[in-house]
Amino acid sequence: TGPVDLIVSGHTHSEVRAEVNGIPIVQARSSGTALGVVTLTWDRGHGEVVDHAIHVWTTRHEGVSPDAEVAALVGRWTDEVEAVAERPIARLARPLRRDRDDESALGDMIADAQREATGDQIALVNGGGIRTGLDAGPVSYADVFAVQPFQNALVSLDLTADQLRRALEAVVQDRLGQVSGVCFRFDPTRPAGERVIEAWLEETGEPIVGEGEVVNAGLTFSVTANNFMAAGGSGYDVLAEADGTATGLVDSEVLMRHLSSLPQPVEYEERGRIERLAPWPE
């Protein structure tokens, strides 16, 4: 057999019972609605898996009495977690909404928090990493966790000017990402990979892209992204080419600290970093 004997998959919330190139693959839907069971038959003489059986069993809870010991344990931990989750960390003067089509104050704040935490020149945030908005009033740990639930680690990357241009092209894919430390103008009606018309550093105004081309190919930039993006996720393939350093920081924790450090109640406006030159195509 090859180096892989079994793939246990997730994330898509699908039921998978499959075999590809002799490798069994299982996924048991989501949220405890099913159990995946795979039986592998091991040949001791040859030191390899020689057979397998895949099952996905639907779970049932109707009419089943909870186990008293387990229920007590769940109740205790629920109470302890809720005490922390509902603890207020900040107060918003107005709602902060996510926006998948344009720059948003929430996206700016998240990107600013990450850039401030790492000290890099630029921060890039994938749009899919911002799951919901924040209402006006008290903001709790649970509220921030709902915005960034994946607990992604932050990575510091060194990008060439052309790699940064390509990363900005990934920002303006079908669903817009958010940025800090860089400003740009883009045309969503242009072909993918050719949408960023102009880009420059936010603090100094130093040009990065002009008329769709890199201005100074010899420049390099320090860029913060989460580990999912740094591995090429969400179309950010170019980031996987770059040298990266783990920062030891987690996105949601960084946002919590940033929010609590701001003058209260928090007022956050869009920074005007992203200019869309035409409507998104239908």
Predicted regions located by residue number:
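Metal-dependent catalytic neighborhoods of phosphoester/phosphodiester hydrolases
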Residues: 1, 16-21
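Active-site-proximal segments of metal-dependent phosphoesterases and phosphodiesterases across multiple
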Residues: 1-9, 101-102
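Long, structured stretches of catalytic cores involved in phosphate-ester chemistry, encompassing
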Residues: 4, 15, 164
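Active-site neighborhood of phospho(di)ester-bond hydrolases with catalytic His/Asp-centered motifs
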Residues: 5-13, 25-28
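Short solvent-exposed loop/turn micro-motifs enriched in small/polar/acidic residues
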Residues: 9-10, 21, 33, 177
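Glycine-rich nucleotide phosphate-binding loop and flanking beta-alpha elements
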Residues: 14-15, 32
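Beta-strand-connecting loop/turn residues
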Residues: 21-22, 45
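Catalytic centers of hydrolytic enzymes
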Residues: 29-282
